[in-house]
């Protein structure tokens, strides 16, 4: 199963978030992994590049602001992402397909109320 298949499978049951929201979280996960673990080494077997919920949310924050700037808040709203809990819901939706892994310590509460979207994605550009 590839990422697009996983998103289709999830969205058959849960349409709260647009496909773009899922892509954004996937790209943010890549960004967070690079922040925490550095660039992946070419030719090396995949090693555990796990990040925690708060680490992923920091990667999400940086990626969104760098990519979308002043449009960040409105795009997130349009795609169904209104709070950090929504990022966690997307992560756990993809985990449920088996495409993303998780550690025993990972839980949805790691994503709850970590920061305010309006404060984070709108205020810096106001």
Question: What spans do the regions from the language model cover?
Answer:
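Non-transmembrane, aqueous-exposed alpha-helical and coiled segments at domain scale
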Residues: 1-126
């Amino acid at each position: 199963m590839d990422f697009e298949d996983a998103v289709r499978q999830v969205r058959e049951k849960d349409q709260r978030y647009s496909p773009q929201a899922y892509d954004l979280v996937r790209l943010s996960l890549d960004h967070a992994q690079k922040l925490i673990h550095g660039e992946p080494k070419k030719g090396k077997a995949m090693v555990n590049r796990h990040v925690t919920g708060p680490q992923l949310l920091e990667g999400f924050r940086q990626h969104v602001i760098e990519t979308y700037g002043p449009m960040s808040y409105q795009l997130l709203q349009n795609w169904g992402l209104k709070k950090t809990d929504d990022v966690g819901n997307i992560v756990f939706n993809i985990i449920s397909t088996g495409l993303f892994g998780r550690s025993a310590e990972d839980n949805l509460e790691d994503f709850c109320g970590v920061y305010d979207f309006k404060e984070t994605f709108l205020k810096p550009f106001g």
